[in-house]
Regions:
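C-terminal capping/gating helix-and-loop segments adjacent to ligand/active sites or protein-protein/ligand interfaces
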Residues: 151, 227, 324, 366-374, ...
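Short helix-initiation/N-cap motifs at beta->coil->alpha
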Residues: 76-85, 178-183, 259-271
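Extracytoplasmic/periplasmic substrate-recognition and gating elements
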Residues: 66, 252-254, 295-363
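Conserved N-terminal structural module of periplasmic/extracytoplasmic solute-binding proteins
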Residues: 2-113, 124-128, 174, 339, ...
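Short, solvent-exposed loop/beta-turn-alpha elements that line the ligand-binding surface or hinge
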Residues: 120-133, 200, 217-241, 295-299, ...
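Extracytoplasmic/periplasmic solute-binding protein
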Residues: 146-152, 158, 182-235
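Hinge/lid segment of periplasmic solute-binding proteins
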Residues: 104-158, 182
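Glycine-centered hinge/linker elements that transmit conformational signals in sensory
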Residues: 187, 228-260
Length: 441
């Protein structure tokens, strides 16, 4: 998705007071400064937990071993905590050297505030590095035609996972349409099995349902109008229809009881699927690696199934399209020293595009953003990797997750309204009115 049409209000102009300073102190790093040991020490913040944290740490260890005169120091945070801490740090001018993110609207706010380095010329001078990265992943790292973030790690479509053993036990088949999903809900409930696992407290997990239902109902144009800042874009009739579908799912008990108190960071939603307490789950492709790591023999024994989210009968959307994260991204803080920026660029041009990096993500069950990865799709994970690669490459449109495509200000309002929608605290029309009020911010 091109970022050149973004027009967002800058959230970084806010003053960070004592609360911000306290939050920074809790982060365990002093921000953009280098250590006083004679080495240039570049700071790297990213997400904790499997499967990503061990791979990120392994990359840093490889780099530090190969470059003894420099050092990269990593600090890891859970997903939701990271989003707040990185926002606070950047607003205070205390960002780490390397800023991990999802691109899109969040990156645009950093660019507007001159907080990140323009990498366009660097990639021009290092064409061999750029050629090792899938071209389609650069869109979310590009703002106004310039590259401000390097695509890293994996392509992550959102998919529908299901527990094959539960389906066999109940005697039903995987859904081929949204109508099939609706038919399955009472059948699983009758057997005391939740139709869908959902970590509703995290909010962005709920958002996946809105993204797919709107796309399958109306195609990409409605959200494209929102993204472009068109006034009252959320008032499209397809949005009200989608929101009504969501609330009907809640009323029909499509989701695990107590979903609004379950967090994604705890991986409790994953456990509900692999333990058979839930039959299905809409989640990111990274879920596979979590279930391999935490689910015992579940995946290896053939218990996990997956598919692209099915189409809606009569809908305008193409069921081959997908949504999710076209990649993850690393930017370089413009407030960091020249020496630390040089360390980051060397990390970009060597370790992050080496064969070990590619192999690490494949082994985790991920499809790397790096080219020529298909030859590594072997062993127990081969079919999953091929299928995720096919979904990502076969989609005419691979839309970026809404909360990443929009500005952080709008994204927070979006997520708050989504939580209220799932808790039946607001009506579809109230949701539309609230979201129309922040379009273009």
């Amino acid at each position: 998705m091109s970022q050149s049409s973004l027009s967002r209000r800058n959230f970084l102009g806010l003053t960070v007071g004592a609360a911000g300073a306290a939050a920074l102190a809790a982060c365990g790093t002093s921000g953009p400064s280098s250590a006083g040991s004679g080495k240039s020490t570049a700071a790297y913040w990213s997400l904790s937990g499997p499967p990503g944290q061990p791979i990120r740490q392994a990359a840093i260890d490889r780099f530090n071993k190969a470059n003894p005169s420099t050092k990269i120091k990593a600090t890891f945070f859970q997903n939701d905590a990271y989003k707040q801490k990185i926002k606070t740090a950047i607003g205070a001018g205390q960002a780490p050297t390397m800023i991990w993110g999802w691109g899109g609207g969040g990156l645009k706010t950093y660019v507007d505030a001159n907080q990140v380095v323009d990498l366009t010329d660097w990639f021009g001078q290092n064409a061999a590095v750029k050629q090792k990265i899938l071209p389609s992943t650069f869109g979310a790292g590009t703002v106004n035609g310039k590259i401000y973030a390097m695509p890293i790690e994996t392509v992550q479509p959102i998919v529908l996972f299901y527990n094959k053993k539960v389906f066999d036990r109940v005697g039903v088949q995987p859904p081929q349409s949204y109508g099939d999903i609706l038919d399955l809900i009472p059948k699983f409930n009758a057997k005391g099995i939740a139709p869908f696992s959902l970590a509703g407290q995290s909010r962005w997990t709920n958002m996946m349902w809105l993204e797919f239902l709107l796309d399958r109902q109306a195609g990409p144009d409605v959200f494209n109008n929102v993204f472009a800042g068109q006034a009252d874009a959320w008032s499209d009739p397809a949005v009200l229809e989608m929101l009504t579908k969501v609330q009907n799912l809640v009323k029909d008990k499509a989701f695990i009881k107590g979903f609004s108190s379950i967090t994604a960071d705890s991986n409790a939603d994953q456990a509900l699927l692999y333990t058979g307490k839930a039959a299905m789950m809409v989640h990111g492709s990274w879920s596979y690696g979590i279930q391999v790591a935490n689910g015992g023999n579940f995946v290896k024994s053939g218990g996990l199934g997956w598919m692209n989210f099915p189409g809606i009968d009569g809908g305008k959307g193409d069921p081959s399209d997908t949504v999710g994260n076209p990649g993850q991204y690393l930017s370089i803080s413009s407030k960091s020293s020249a020496a630390d920026q040089a360390v980051a660029k060397k990390f970009f041009s060597t370790t992050l595009v080496d064969d070990a990096e590619k192999a690490g993500w494949v082994k985790s069950g991920g499809v790397p953003v790096l080219t020529d990865s298909a030859s590594l799709f072997t062993g127990d994970d081969a079919q999953y990797l091929k299928d995720m690669s096919a979904i990502a490459s076969g989609a005419k449109i691979f839309a970026q997750s809404w909360d990443q495509a929009l500005s952080p200000t709008v994204a927070e309002t979006l997520l708050d309204n989504i939580a209220k929608l799932f808790q039946l605290q607001i009506s579809p029309q109230q949701w539309v009115d609230s979201m129309n009020g922040v379009i273009g911010q």
